[in-house]
Amino acid sequence: MKFLSTILLVFICSPVLAEDITIKMLNKDSDGNKMVFSEEVARIEVGDTITWVPTSKGHNVEMRASPNKLKFKSKPNKKVAITFDTPGIYYYWCTPHKGMGMIGLIVVGGDLSNIDQISKAKAFGKTKKKLKSLVQSLN
C-alpha cells in the first residue's frame, strides 16, 4: 500500500514540478546585440514549457532541428508556448531574422545525443557562425 501511495504521489505532483520559462524575442538586448532571443541556450527538464514572447513586431519562432522531428512555426507577433517531452537538443530561429543570427538552442534533460544533427542543420549568414559557437558551448 505504501508503494502504491508513493507512485500516486509522484504522478500527481509531477505537473507541479514542471517549469514555465519565458524567452523574449528582442530587437536589441541590454548589451546592444540586435535581433536576439533573451536566452540563446535554455537548459530545461522533460515536461517543462518554454513561452516565447515578442517584445517588438516582426518576430516568430520556427523549429529547425530536434530529436523528435518537431515541425513548428508560429505566426509573427504572437506569444507561443511549447512543452518539451522528448530529451535532446532543439534548434530554432526567428524566420524573418534568421540571416542576422536570431537563433536559439534548447537542451532538454541534459541530453546531447543529437548534437551532430544540430551541428549539421541548415544555417547561413551570421546564423552559421553563431550556431557553431552555441553548439561548442554545450560541451
State the predicted function of each range:
Residues C13-S14:
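N-terminal signal peptide c-region/cleavage motif recognized by signal peptidases
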